[in-house]
Every structure is written in C-alpha cells, then in structure tokens.
C-alpha cells in the first residue's frame, strides 16, 4: 500500500470538502479509511500501529463532519419545498368580484384563409368591442423591456453552445491524433493478435549504452543497423540498405540480452520480444500463422526490431531425424518472411525497416538458411581486463566502498569470468557486511536495527571472500569452440 496514495487521497477529500463538493469528498474519505485499515493490518510495529490508529480516528471524525453537513443540506431542501394549497384554503367566491381570467392557449397561426363575409366580420368586431369594454382600457405591456434581455441571453446561450461544440470537436480531434495506431486484425484470430501485442515492449527497460561495459564493436554495429537508417534515410538505400538480421553469438552471461534491452531503450523503435513459446501452438497450422502475423504486425508498426532470444530452439538445423513436421513448417515460414518472394519486401523508405535481432549460445545448431539471412554474425566475448574493471564500477556505483578496495586488482583476479559472474561476485560482496552485523542476533533485534547500522562500507576482504565462493561459469573448451565457429562463419 503506497503512503503517497493515502496522503494524496486525504488531500483531495479535504479540497472537495472545502469547495462544497461533499459527495466526492465522502467517496475519497471512505477510500482513505479503507486504505488505512489495510495498511494497519500490514504493520508489525506496535508503536506505528498506535500512531496510525490516531490518524484513522482523526480522518473518521472529518468524514463524520462532512456527512453531518450533507444531512443538514438535505433537510434544508426538504423544508424549502412550498406546501400545496388545498381546496379549503382558497378564498371564498364573491359574486360581485370578477374571477381571474383563464389563460389563453397559444395555438400556431393558421395559414392564409379565404376572405370572410361582411356579416361575419361585423359580428367579430361587435364581440371584440364587448370584450374590450369588459377588460377595461388598454395598458402598455410590461413584457417589452424584458424581451430584449431575453433575446440577448438567448444569443449568449447559443454562442456558448456553439463554442462548446467547437471545443468538443477540437478535443476529440486532438485525442484521435494522439491515439496510437492500431493493427487491423481482419482475417486473423483475435487471441493471436493480442498474444503478439503483449510481446511489444511498451515499457522502457531503462538500459542505456553506458550501462554496458566494453563490447564497443557490438554497440557500434547495432547503432549502424538500427539508429543510423532513421537519421539518414537518404543514405541507406540500394546496396547500402540497412542490415535485416543480426545474430549475437557468445557464451552465457556476456550481455547479449542486455544489448537487446539497450536497443529497445535507445533506438525508439517498436520492439517485439519473441521467444519459442510465442510462436508455438498445439493446433495444426497455427504456428505458421503466428510467424506470418508477427512479421505483418512488425511491418505495420515499423520501424521495428524483432528480438528472438535463444533462436536455436526455434530454428535448429533442418533434415535431422529428430525434427518434427510442425517445427519444419515453422522454420520454413520464418525463412520466407525474413527473405522470401512474398515476405520481407524491400521498402524504399529505410526508416520503415524490420530488423531481426537474434541471440544464441549454440550457433552450430542453427539452420544454414537462417544463418545466411542473419547477415551480421558478431561474437560477444568474455570481458577484457578493462571491461571487467568497468563492469565493477557500474555494479558498485550505488555502494559505499572502503578505502582499501582496489578495483583494478579485483578485475585481474577475475580473468575468465563472464559479465553475469562478475555481477554475482559484486552482489555477494555487498552482502558480507550485513551478514557480519546480524550474526547471532534474534529476529526482533534484526528488525529494530537502524538503517545506518546496516549500510556499512564494503571492504577488500569482502571481495576476496566472494571470489572464493563464486567460480567462473564458462570453461576454456567452450571459449575455443565459440572462437572456432566465429572464425569460420562470423560476419562482423
């Protein structure tokens, strides 16, 4: 439960009460009291519980005052209604006093009539004279001055209505312009479209290029493949068209997925995060439809980057005895969509491109045709000594370090460690001071520790202990295998 939300709701309730909008104020007061009840149940500290109970009592008193005001206003409305006059209260009829005239009904004026006879007109004039004598002398109408005011008010009202209509139409047009474009799912299953739309990363992963240590060549290539074609669309045409596919190869934990997150953050393109579960279905023929739908949606939302992590699980080598017919059809559809006759057509505008960014730890299992379509195949190696030191600085930038910590010395000791291994070492070392502080304490004593007591600087000894506990996860034989493959099939 967010304390900021509770305070904001209390503020709104009080503002509505001050403005006289008591109905809205009561809604907010009721919501605040419910939120505070939930928060009270989650508290373990008795002192804090007492404080919050006092606050709850004060808020409930305020809500009661607002409720009393609402009741009082309601009683005013009931008392102010005039009582209907009964027949007995009417004054007695006096025979010598004329009764009030019955209000005449206004009827629409009839159309042109035929000329009436003289006899009828004489009778009508005679009757008019009698009625005029009965009514008395003619008096000037008292409604004339107000007619002008009514006309002015009518014009003002009409102007306000026209103005309101213009503002409404303007706001609706602005809303329609600000609304994101929606893919037309005609001809496709609605559930399939929604499943793929969920894989569009609309939230910002918040990973910048500076958050990735080393890997200068990989970052340069991704910028050239994704960012530059949008900045210089006139240049990237013909033979200089942007790369359609980039394959990142390397041992686990070297930053391949992190590079994809940086592309999603920095490149401002529509980013599809696709896995094998996204493109597989138990129904026959539906997986191929998913692949085709994915690329059609990517072209609609272009410029687009489709990131396929662990692509070897989707598009492994064809023709093996263990291959199933369904997976073979999915691979064929993926290859056609990437570079087929009816698939990835070359658009004249390079800013509307669709790029496939793939990552794998088993490049030797990928199909040859897919390897050809992934035009750039780059090796993401283990971090160098400079990269390891930079990684240590990035991971430890929020921690307080002791004066005896030498990051260059620690980086030398971590030769052969991947980026994920270095992060694990930093995490383990950062917890050492806390482990020493709570050793031998009861749970109640641990709960009562202050924040300053827990935030102690990490020492060089902590890193040495962490290095003994965390070993490297990549063997030298694996590194040799990756380097041999990249020498044979690499395209940096």
From Swiss-Prot:
UniProtKB keywords: ATP-binding, Cell cycle, Cell division, Cytoplasm, Cytoskeleton, Isomerase, Microtubule, Mitosis, Nucleotide-binding
Binding site for ATP: 250-257
Domain of life assignment: Eukaryota
Region (Disordered): 80-186
InterPro entries: AAA+_ATPase, AAA_lid_3, ATPase_AAA_core, ATPase_AAA_CS, KATNA1, KATNA1_MIT, KTNA1_AAA_dom, MT-severing_AAA_ATPase
EC number: 5.6.1.1
Reaction catalyzed: n ATP + n H2O + a microtubule = n ADP + n phosphate + (n+1) alpha/beta tubulin heterodimers
Top EC class, one word: isomerase
A Gene Ontology BP annotation from the UniProt entry: microtubule severing
GO MF entries: ATP binding; ATP hydrolysis activity; microtubule binding; microtubule severing ATPase activity
Known partners and oligomeric status: Can homooligomerize into hexameric rings, which may be promoted by interaction with microtubules. Interacts with KATNB1, which may serve as a targeting subunit.
HAMAP family for the chain: Katanin_p60_A1
Protein name: Katanin p60 ATPase-containing subunit A1
